[in-house]
Amino acid sequence: MNENLFASFATPTMVGLPIVILIIMFPSILFPSPNRLINNRLISIQQWLVQLTSKQMMAIHNSKGQTWTLMLMSLILFIGSTNLLGLLPHSFTPTTQLSMNLGMAIPLWAGTVFMGFRHKTKAALAHFLPQGTPIFLIPMLVIIETISLFIQPVALAVRLTANITAGHLLMHLIGGATLALMSISPSTALITFIILILLTILEFAVAMIQAYVFTLLVSLYLHDNT
C-alpha cells in the first residue's frame, strides 16, 4: 500500500535506458502476416474484424479519403492492442502518456487540415466564418474558430489519456482496498473483489472503445477536409 499510486505510469527502463520503443513495437507481434493458403481461425477473425471496421469507418469518404484506409486501420489496431496489453498485471500502457498521444494526434490532425487547404481551399477557409455572421462579430468568430481548430488534436489526445488513466487508477485503488480488507473483513473484501472483476471487464470494453473513438474522430476530421 506504500507504493506510489502513479508508479505504474512511469516509463519503464532497462539498464537505465527507456524501453518504451520496444513496448510500442510489441503489438505488431499480435497481428502476424499469414504464411499459408488457408488461414486459421484466429487470423480469419482478425481479418473479419478489420474488414468490418474499415467498411463502417470509411463508408463516408470519397476516393481521396479512401487512401487513408491503411493508416486508420493500423492506428485502431495499434491503440486497441496497446490498451488491451496495458490491462495485464505489471505491464505498461503507452497510451497513458499524454506526450505519446499528442505525438499521434497532432501529425494526423495536421495531415487532414493540410489536405483540406490543398484540395478544398475555399471550403476550408469558409469554416472560419459561418454564413450570415454579423460584420461586427467577424473578428471574434474568426479567432474562436481558429482556437477550436487548433484545440482538436489536444482534445483528441487528452480524451484518450484521461479515459485510460482513470480506469487504471480506479483498478489500482480497488485492488489495493481488496488486499487491505482481506485480513480485516473478508466479506467486504469479497464484495470489492467482485467489483474489481466487473471493472476489469468494463476496462476491456473501454480499451477497445477508446481506440475506435480516437480513430473515428480522425476519420471525421479527414471527412471534413476531403
UniProtKB/Swiss-Prot annotation:
GO terms for cellular component: mitochondrial inner membrane; proton-transporting ATP synthase complex. It catalyses: H(+)(in) = H(+)(out). Keywords: ATP synthesis, CF(0), Hydrogen ion transport, Ion transport, Membrane, Mitochondrion, Mitochondrion inner membrane, Transmembrane, Transmembrane helix, Transport. PROSITE patterns: ATPASE_A. It is a multi-pass membrane protein. One of its GO terms (molecular function) is proton-transporting ATP synthase activity, rotational mechanism. InterPro entries: ATP_synth_F0_asu, ATP_synth_F0_asu_AS, ATP_synth_F0_asu_bact/mt, F0_ATP_A_sf. Its main location: mitochondrion. GO terms for biological process: proton motive force-driven ATP synthesis; proton motive force-driven mitochondrial ATP synthesis; proton transmembrane transport. It is found in: Mitochondrion inner membrane. The chain crosses the membrane at residues 12-32, 68-88, 97-117, 135-155, 164-184, 189-209. Subunit a, of the mitochondrial membrane ATP synthase complex (F(1)F(0) ATP synthase or Complex V) that produces ATP from ADP in the presence of a proton gradient across the membrane which is generated by electron transport complexes of the respiratory chain. ATP synthase complex consist of a soluble F(1) head domain - the catalytic core - and a membrane F(1) domain - the membrane proton channel. These two domains are linked by a central stalk rotating inside the F(1) region and a stationary peripheral stalk. Belongs to the ATPase A chain family. PANTHER family: ATP SYNTHASE SUBUNIT A. Component of the ATP synthase complex composed at least of ATP5F1A/subunit alpha, ATP5F1B/subunit beta, ATP5MC1/subunit c (homooctomer), MT-ATP6/subunit a, MT-ATP8/subunit 8, ATP5ME/subunit e, ATP5MF/subunit f, ATP5MG/subunit g, ATP5MK/subunit k, ATP5MJ/subunit j, ATP5F1C/subunit gamma, ATP5F1D/subunit delta, ATP5F1E/subunit epsilon, ATP5PF/subunit F6, ATP5PB/subunit b, ATP5PD/subunit d, ATP5PO/subunit OSCP. This is ATP synthase F(0) complex subunit a. It comes from Equus caballus. The gene is MT-ATP6.
